[in-house]
Amino acid sequence: MNINYPAEYEIGDIVFTCIGAALFGQISAASNCWSNHVGIIIGHNGEDFLVAESRVPLSTITTLSRFIKRSSNQRYAIKRLDAGLTERQKQRIVEQVPSRLRKLYHTGFKYESSRQFCSKFVFDIYKEALCIPVGEIETFGELLNSNPNAKLTFWKFWFLGSIPWERKTVTPASLWHHPGLVLIHAEGVETPQPELTEAV
């Protein structure tokens, strides 16, 4: 049975959710954003959309409904490049996925690593497929010093006593706030951007 959604989703759409685990809660606090997990739609299996994601322990493909169910209170939002994607661009995005699957999750969120984490996974797919940065690479110093809500004691504990201030990373928040993305639909998100009134 085909699952119906409130909007028409497409390959390349970025799915934002909120994982309730403690680590991901600290990611939200550090980046001052409701979302702490992202994936990317890469197709449809005849019943549901398929989402590629980097998660613990390995990057994989799941269905959109399962992806949403893992979110706290099933909150989610979907964004798309404001200009939309051509069929060739969608194909290029899909072509980037296989080589990135079954990669270990990097719990230290180091961008310059062979391991994956969710925002790096989506950021790199767009960068390699379309030469479009849909987020921002920043250091932990820039991230944590820019937000008074960040709990440094947690991150010192997480990094075994010493925060790697110069380590580069990319956060779900930087994707969420990227000006080139427009909101297609949101469920349970308190302050979403205005939804599109016209087709992209």
Curated annotation (Swiss-Prot):
Signal peptide: none
Stored Pfam families: Peptidase_C92
Gene3D superfamilies xrefs: endopeptidase domain like (from Nostoc punctiforme)
Family label: To E.coli YiiX.
Protein name per Swiss-Prot or TrEMBL: Uncharacterized protein YebB
Gene of this entry: yebB
